[in-house]
Amino acid sequence: MPVHNEILLVDEVCQSVEKAVRKMPELRVTIVDDGSNDGTGKSFQKNLKKVKNTKVILLGTNGGKGRAVREGFRDATEEKLIFMDGDMAYSMDHLEPMKVSLTKYDVVIGSRSMVPQAQGGLPARRAFLGWGFNRLACSLLGIDFPDTQAGLKGFTQKAAKALFAKQRLNDFAFDVELLYLCRKLGLSVGQIPAQVTSIHTYKTSQVKLIFDSLKCFQEILLIRWWSWTGAYRLGK
């Protein structure tokens, strides 16, 4: 679970994690603090100190969601690996259907488009830019998913090793790159409904939202370039 500057949500997340671990004794939860400067990482360490099957990794600098996810999966030995955003966008209730779906697919992604009104309350500009980015990414990269950006994705151990050995981006288009690599590696991809929690808030300003959208477009082109130059070549 990658987190960055989420000090106000630490208690809520820890309660959800503790409840999930009690419900699923086989569950192992790793919180990866991506260089927070508000004490998020230390607070997670304190709150989860006595909670079984949990671990907190502190990254000294902010390197992006992609790096945080890779670090969280680096030493994982479980047969099914799942990452979900640490800002409480999605509840732990998604873990069970994700786990079940991973018995049928190599990769399973959460899709907000499968939940009626899942984007309720989402600012119009954000919704429009998100839809536009998704369609642009799918068109340029030859993939077809109604929701590439939901921070809820699961992998079999074998699929995760194959994907993260090739994956390069650290943020912005990180999720799109993963799905592009799924197609390139011939991995099967399933989808489950991803319901956004009622307490989740979108913190990005309008200016940063537009800048991030432009950065995402740049990274989509970078994915195309890497593919064309053989950077993703199998066995490389």
Where are these regions (language model features)?
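Donor nucleotide-sugar binding loop of glycosyltransferases
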Residues: 6-9, 36, 65, 91
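Short, well-formed alpha-helical segments that are part of the catalytic scaffolds
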Residues: 6-20
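Conserved donor nucleotide-binding strand/loop of the catalytic core
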Residues: 27-31, 41-75
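Acidic helix N-cap motif at the loop->helix transition within catalytic regions
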Residues: 8-12, 38-47
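A conserved acidic beta->alpha catalytic loop
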Residues: 33-42, 88
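Acceptor/aglycone-binding surface of glycosyltransferases and processive sugar-polymer synthases
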Residues: 59-75, 80, 92-172, 199-218, ...
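Catalytic donor-sugar/metal-binding loop of nucleotide-sugar-dependent glycosyltransferases
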Residues: 143-144, 168-170, 179-197
